Swiss-Prot record:
CDD domains: MFS_LmrB_MDR_like (cd17503). Keywords: Antibiotic resistance, Cell membrane, Membrane, Transmembrane, Transmembrane helix, Transport. This is Lincomycin resistance protein LmrB. Belongs to the major facilitator superfamily. EmrB family. It comes from Bacillus subtilis (strain 168). It is found in: Cell membrane. Proton-dependent transporter. May mediate the efflux of lincomycin. Signal peptide: none annotated. Its main location: membrane. The lineage of its organism: Bacteria, Bacillati, Bacillota, Bacilli, Bacillales. Coiled coil: none annotated. It holds the Pfam family MFS_1. One of its GO terms (molecular function) is transmembrane transporter activity. It is a multi-pass membrane protein.
Length: 479
């Protein structure tokens, strides 16, 4: 059993309580993040706001993660595991409570930002803790268990919130989450142990400023580009991306010239870590763009209700969650290559089928395709991530997890922005060929055409990942 107590040379960790604390907090955090997505239409009506405005509930969340996660490597070296866990849960509880009571959009946006502070602290802490408390030959299975939570929570989020919205209102999405977060905090206070060493390196303010400008600018720019208000030609988007890229270059130069960098980019001298980062980046682009495109296609192309759309996506998400521990164990036994290559083959084939869906495609077909997509993703994500982190020496763990989690946020922003832009262009091209664009029957067909174009982009990204997968090697851990 993967949650059995494992030992470090000088210290005994109670692995089961630590893992339960992390899994419970992570589950509710990921659930809260995705459960709100299906309520955005209701929020637009109730709060009398536009689509571009309501999108800030997602953009603001991603922006905070994009700024906070890069700093997490420094925080992990300054504060104990218990301190970071407790503070992350307090932020999550406070944000959820404010959201449950929110009388206006401003309050709800503020609540989402506070929630993001909690998630931004928790995600790197989860991965870093696993690297410390589990020996290398058990990390795959442990990462798989974390994967179960990370994938299972978003799977049931839309279905659950669709059910809540049918009988209650969006406030209850937060009220129902609140007691579970409190339970996670109480459990963590009782059982969480300090597993990381607090070396308290010197804080370089300029590094934090450059990191905030660099990562924040890129996430903000891509998120705004995907909202459709001006798109890629918007001055806000162009300036944000330029400032972000310049900030990122200056940040990288400073980190490589410092004796004690905030984020040690020398982790990139390990080839399997680089390849692992690329695989995870591609995987996140595919999965997050698909999570955006499929609900839009199901509701706009096949004209299903929000609840029905959630049910269609439920089997794939659940199976993905349960596949993660299985692929984790297979990784421990066989290494990454024989999981990641077949995984990318499955993902590429499924995305080709998705690029050919029509307004007459059946819900059963979408369930089968989505389930296969999730199986493929589960074969790639955790094995690639674990193999990459395994090559790093112990002192690089906080930096490695910070780099991985930061680039996942960027992948999400980039993947969804490009997918939405391609979808909008595909819709526009289709409408330009129609004799009567005002015909309501044309709208689902136009949206479906846009979705087809966007899935072609996702398929090309997956093919790049497949090529990279052939270069993966199992890391021999000697540290």
């Amino acid at each position: 059993m993967i949650l059995e107590t494992t030992a470090k040379a000088s210290q005994q960790y109670k692995v089961m309580p630590i893992m339960i604390s992390l899994l419970l907090a992570g589950f509710i955090g990921m659930f809260s993040e995705t459960a709100l997505n299906i309520a955005l239409t209701d929020l637009m009506k109730e709060l009398n706001i536009t689509a571009a405005t309501v999108q800030w509930l997602t953009t603001g969340y991603l922006l905070v993660l994009g700024i906070l996660v890069p700093v997490s490597g420094l925080l992990l070296q300054w504060f104990t595991t218990r301190q970071l866990f407790t503070v992350s849960l307090i932020f999550s509880i406070l944000g959820t409570f404010i959201a449950a009571l929110a009388p206006s959009f401003s309050f709800l946006l503020a609540a989402r930002i506070v929630q993001a502070l909690g998630t931004g602290l928790l995600l790197p802490l989860m991965f870093n803790t696993i690297l410390v408390i589990f020996p290398p030959h058990k990390r795959g299975a442990a990462m798989g268990t974390i994967g179960l939570v990370i994938m299972f929570a978003p799977a049931i989020g839309p279905t659950f919130s669709g059910l809540v919205l049918e009988h209650l209102n969006w406030h209850w999405i937060f009220w129902i989450s609140l007691p579970f977060l409190v339970l996670a905090l109480v459990f963590g206070i009782a059982y969480m142990q300090n597993v990381s060493e607090t070396t308290k390196p010197k804080i370089d303010v300029l590094s934090i400023i450059l990191s905030t400008i660099g990562f924040g600018g890129i996430v903000f720019g891509f998120s705004n580009a995907g909202e459709g208000s001006g798109g890629w030609s918007s001055p806000t988007v162009i300036v944000s991306l330029i400032v972000g890229v310049v900030g990122l270059i200056l940040f990288s130069i400073r980190q490589l010239t410092m004796k004690q960098p905030m984020m040690n980019l020398r982790a990139f001298k390990y080839p399997m870590f680089i390849l692992g980062v690329i695989m995870v980046f591609i995987c996140m682009m595919v999965i997050l763009s698909s999570m955006l495109l499929l609900p839009m296609y199901l509701q706009g192309g096949l004209v299903l209700t929000a609840f029905a759309s959630g049910l269609v996506l439920l089997p794939g998400g659940i199976l993905n969650g349960f596949m993660s521990p299985v692929t984790g164990r297979l990784f421990d036994k066989y290494g990454p290559k024989w999981l990641v290559i077949p995984g990318f083959v499955i993902v590429t084939v499924v995305l080709w089928f998705f690029s050919n869906v029509t307004t007459t495609s059946t819900a059963v077909l979408i369930i089968i395709l989505h389930t296969c997509l999730m199986i493929g993703i589960s074969m790639i994500m955790m094995p690639a991530q674990t193999n990459g982190l395994n090559q790093l020496p112990r002192e690089f763990y906080p930096d490695g997890t910070a780099i991985m989690n930061t680039l996942q946020q960027m992948a999400g922003a980039i993947g969804t922005a490009v997918a939405v832009s391609i979808m909008a262009a595909g819709q526009h091209d289709y409408m330009s060929t129609v004799k009567n664009p005002a015909d309501p029957a044309v709208i689902p067909q136009a949206l479906t055409a846009g979705v087809q174009h966007a899935f072609v982009f996702a398929m090309i990204v997956a093919i790049i990942g497949l090529i990279g997968a052939f270069f993966m090697k199992r890391v021999k851990v000697d540290h």
